[in-house]
């Protein structure tokens, strides 16, 4: 059965999460995987949510549902984000990968908004879980440097 490429992306996500585990501790592999996932997400986010093809032998139209941007974020990005919420290197690469993922000219505004929501969640996790103020500030600067718009500011001053 054709999974539309999501099966391979899930395997890559699993490799990234395992590479970050204390038993394996291979951040280089995790970085490589996140970079590659950013490129794949860029391609996947360009597909429309529905496609239709008329069969040549009649009046039958086959409608295909492609995986939504929201499902991609839940299946591919969230596990990496949640597992690496204390790792500023992976968080930095994930910010860059997600920014690249929505950089194409054929990405819908709806898909961009879904990725921006994931970036909001990443920013929230960063503010809440990274204790070192210098590291935290370095990663937060990425949001400005990459000109990421529509991100909410979370007040975590009491944390």
Can you describe what each PLM-predicted range is?
Residues 1-159:
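Short basic (Lys/Arg) and small-residue
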């Amino acid at each position: 059965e054709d999974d539309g490429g999501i099966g391979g992306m899930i395997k890559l996500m699993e490799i990234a999460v395992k590479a970050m585990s204390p038993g394996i501790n291979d951040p280089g592999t995790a970085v490589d995987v996140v970079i590659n996932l950013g490129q794949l997400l860029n391609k996947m986010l360009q597909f429309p949510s529905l496609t239709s093809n008329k069969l040549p032998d009649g009046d039958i139209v086959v409608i295909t549902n492609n995986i939504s941007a929201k499902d991609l974020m839940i299946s591919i990005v969230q596990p990496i984000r949640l597992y690496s919420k204390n790792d500023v290197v992976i968080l930095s690469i994930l910010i860059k990968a997600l920014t690249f993922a929505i950089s194409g000219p054929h990405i819908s505004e709806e898909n961009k908004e879904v990725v921006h929501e994931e970036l909001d969640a990443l920013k929230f996790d960063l503010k809440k879980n990274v204790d070192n103020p210098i590291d935290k500030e370095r990663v937060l600067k990425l949001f400005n440097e990459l000109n990421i718009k529509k991100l909410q500011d979370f007040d975590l001053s009491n944390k």
